[in-house]
């Protein structure tokens, strides 16, 4: 993990397209601004974790449905 120190108003870049700026500090909270292309998804960790869980559930359901359909097709022959 790369650890950097920034002051309010300072930025860092990830690649050519992503810029992260430290906007402010209030107590134990830090406000950051993220400038990234629209095709780059940016999520808070708790939202990202929820998306991953829901995607896994959906993939499991899809796999189960596919197996059920294949089983029905095979039993018809």
UniProtKB/Swiss-Prot annotation:
This is Translational regulator CsrA. One of its GO terms (biological process) is mRNA catabolic process. A translational regulator that binds mRNA to regulate translation initiation and/or mRNA stability. Usually binds in the 5'-UTR at or near the Shine-Dalgarno sequence preventing ribosome-binding, thus repressing translation. Its main target seems to be the major flagellin gene, while its function is anatagonized by FliW. NCBIfam families: csrA, PRK01712.1. Homodimer; the beta-strands of each monomer intercalate to form a hydrophobic core, while the alpha-helices form wings that extend away from the core. Gene3D superfamilies: Translational regulator CsrA. Residues 68-77 have a biased composition (Polar residues). Keywords: Bacterial flagellum biogenesis, Cytoplasm, Repressor, RNA-binding, Translation regulation. Residues 58-77 are annotated as: Disordered. The keyword GTP-binding does not apply. Belongs to the CsrA/RsmA family. GO terms for molecular function: mRNA 5'-UTR binding. One of its GO terms (cellular component) is cytosol. Its main location: cytoplasm. PANTHER family: CARBON STORAGE REGULATOR (PTHR34984:SF1). It is found in: Cytoplasm. SUPFAM superfamilies: CsrA-like. The keyword Cytoplasm applies.
């Amino acid at each position: 993990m790369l650890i950097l120190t920034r002051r309010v108003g300072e930025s860092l870049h990830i690649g050519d397209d992503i810029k992260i700026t430290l906007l402010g500090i209030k107590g134990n909270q830090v406000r950051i601004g993220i400038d990234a292309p629209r095709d780059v998804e940016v999520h808070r960790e708790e939202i990202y974790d929820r998306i991953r869980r829901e995607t896994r559930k959906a993939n499991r359901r899809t796999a189960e449905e596919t197996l059920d359909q294949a089983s029905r097709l095979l039993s018809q022959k």
